A protein has these predicted regions:
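Surface-exposed beta-loop interaction hotspot
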Residues: 108-153, 266-269
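Short beta-strand/turn micro-motifs at beta-sheet edges
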Residues: 1-4, 48-51, 135-142, 186-190
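Active-site-flanking beta-strand signature of metal-NTP-handling nucleotidyl enzymes
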Residues: 7-17, 147-155
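Short hydrophobic/aromatic beta-strand micro-patches
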Residues: 15-17, 63-65, 155, 201-203
């Protein structure tokens, strides 16, 4: 995979301002009504998520996606700080900067010193039926979109090198068959709190699609079991994976999140 042309994902924890007595419903009302007007940098999109289940249930996460590494570093440097071009972007958009200031009265914004990790893409299922586009959209005369994003942190087994694990994934990614409307990504931390650590990111077209296959923590429906039975090579690939590293799902640390807001200027990455 050509790293120079693959997306970059940056994940930032977002916390409610409890000292001001902010309730989550007030924050979510703001981000849906007004926060969506905060633009993304050119070639970027942002999505605000709320934990549905797992480790960070009812907690928030901001996901930035840039179309490639050059587009990411144009605005954020290797230390997670804004570049001169990023500062200029906000100076030229005082209305957007004012919305960010209003956001900060409810919760932290996705910026230092919040916990974050910038991830590169090791591999993805390029044959997924999930179309490119925003993870959240709620606008008149357009189809509503509210995707689910699962983040599953992984760990290598003793004696397994990163090079060996990544080679296995890239050599075998063609064997991965996702559920309809799901898309698998393997990420590797490049900076921030989870440097050099791996995560599986699953983007799912809707909450209904998640529940059609896995309505609860590690619960599989009949539809999911039929899919597995029909795609045995994928299951064999996952068994081989488990000899090298932990796999997505319990007992690993993971959270399924629901998209609750996102930038409405949809010049999103391809």
């Amino acid at each position: 995979m050509n790293v120079s042309t693959t997306p970059v994902f940056s994940l930032h924890y977002v916390g409610i301002n409890l000292k001001r007595g902010i309730a989550s419903d007030r924050f979510e009302d703001f981000v849906r009504r007004k926060g969506v007007a905060i633009p993304a940098y050119p070639g970027w999109q942002w999505t605000l998520l709320r934990g549905l289940r797992g480790e960070r249930e009812n907690q928030y996460l901001m996901v930035y996606q840039a179309k490639d590494a050059a587009t990411y570093t144009r605005y954020i440097d290797g230390n997670g700080e804004l570049t001169d071009e990023a500062h200029a972007f906000w100076r030229q958009r005082p209305e957007a900067a004012a919305l960010i200031e209003e956001w900060r009265t409810f919760a932290t914004f996705a910026e230092l010193p919040t916990l974050y990790t910038c991830y590169s893409l090791v591999a993805e299922n390029s044959r997924s039926s999930l179309p490119p586009g925003p993870n959240y959209r709620d606008q008149p005369r357009q189809e509503s979109i509210q995707r689910v994003i699962g983040i599953h942190n992984l760990a290598l087994k003793a004696g397994v090198t990163p090079q060996r694990f990544e080679r296995f994934i890239t050599d075998n990614i063609h064997r991965v068959e996702d559920y309809p409307g799901w898309k698998f990504h393997l990420l590797k931390g490049q900076s921030g709190n989870r440097l050099d650590q791996y995560a599986v990111m699953l983007i799912i077209e809707s909450l209904a699609s998640l529940n059609a296959f896995h309505p609860d923590l590690d619960v599989s429906t009949e539809q999911a079991l039929r899919f597995v039975a029909e795609h045995q090579d994928t299951e064999h690939m996952y068994d081989e994976w488990k000899t090298l590293a932990s796999f997505s799902g319990a007992p690993q640390i993971y959270t399924d999140y629901l998209a609750i807001s996102g930038n409405e200027n949809h010049a999103h990455p391809a």
